[in-house]
Design a protein with these regions (language model features):
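Bacterial N-terminal signal peptides
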Residues: 7-15
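Cyclophilin-like peptidyl-prolyl cis-trans isomerases
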Residues: 14-295
Length: 295
């Protein structure tokens, strides 16, 4: 049975999504559009793109990696996860309305063999050869924004990059030229800090279990770091989904095709009965791509 993980599961018979007037009682909400999308509009996320984080207290977090945007950093992360390097480390920083960050609090652990300690910057990539689904609404941080293979992106005509939307995962780093190895990761837990776009390597997004990151007590130190080691949240393990026990594995899908186009339009122009004035637009981070658990 298909279970919707991050989309409100509201059963609805297929209806015509377009040309609906504001306040139309028959207008579906974005969640209803996603819940009633045909199976063919859901695209499988390969298991090879998934990491499974389990906190020592039993929290489960699933991260999808973005290897087509930061291949070297993602390659590092795969090696780190496969070596179980993060097992026994901790969540060390929770900054309100910003990020939660995890890794080795001692900063003394030796990186696994084959990890590149100082990769080249992977903050954007050429757009040539790609066909993003651009949206028409203006954006203060990029000439254009849109989606590519389910990822929120910005672009300037020559290059394309991932955007710092809620739940996106990036690589912690020091001042340039440092780019971070991938051993320190963070997830966005607040209003999208888009000023970080093209300044840090974004390597993926949390697709399940954000509550185990975003609901943590806020750190009281500078930048939200915990000042007392007892406050840190222990990480039981972070491993490739392929290495998880059969009972812990799950498959995921993201919404695409015509259903996503209808969903995107509905996010920008709410026509369901509660809304009197459709906004007529939405920023890319206010159109979270629906992702569901498929098994």
């Amino acid at each position: 049975m298909i279970k919707v993980a991050l989309v409100a599961a509201v059963a609805l018979a297929p209806v015509a999504w377009f040309a609906l007037a504001p306040g139309d009682a028959s207008a579906p909400s974005p969640a209803e559009i996603a819940a009633s999308a045909p199976p063919g509009d859901w695209i499988d996320i390969p298991e090879s793109e998934l990491l499974l984080m389990e906190t020592a207290e039993g929290g489960r977090v699933v991260i999808q990696m973005a290897s087509e945007f930061a291949p070297v950093h993602v390659g590092n992360i795969r090696k780190i996860a496969a070596a179980r390097w993060w097992d026994g480390t901790s969540i060390n920083r929770v900054q309100d309305n910003y990020v939660v960050q995890w890794g080795d609090a001692t900063e003394r652990k030796t990186l696994p063999e084959g990890v590149i300690a100082k990769p080249a910057a992977e903050y954007f990539r050429p757009v040539k050869g790609l066909s993003p689904d651009w949206i028409d609404w203006p954006d203060p941080y990029a000439k254009r924004t849109g989606f590519w293979k389910g990822w929120p992106v910005g672009g300037d005509g020559d290059n394309i990059w991932l955007t710092h939307c809620y739940g996106m995962v990036g690589v912690g780093r020091n001042l340039a030229p440092d780019t971070g190895s991938g051993a320190e990761l963070y997830a966005v837990i607040g209003h999208a800090p888009r000023h970080l776009d093209r300044n840090i390597a974004l390597v993926g997004r949390v697709i399940e279990g954000m509550e185990f990151l975003a609901s943590r007590p806020r750190g009281t130190g500078d930048l939200g770091f915990y000042t007392d080691g007892q406050q840190r949240i222990a990480i039981g393990s972070i491993k490739p989904m392929s290495d998880a026990e059969a009972g812990a594995k799950s498959r995921y899908q993201y919404l695409s095709s015509k259903s996503f186009s209808a969903y995107r339009d509905a996010r920008a122009n709410r026509r369901d009965p509660f809304f009197n004035v459709p906004a007529g637009g939405a920023d890319v981070c206010n159109i979270p791509v629906p992702i569901r658990r498929a098994s």
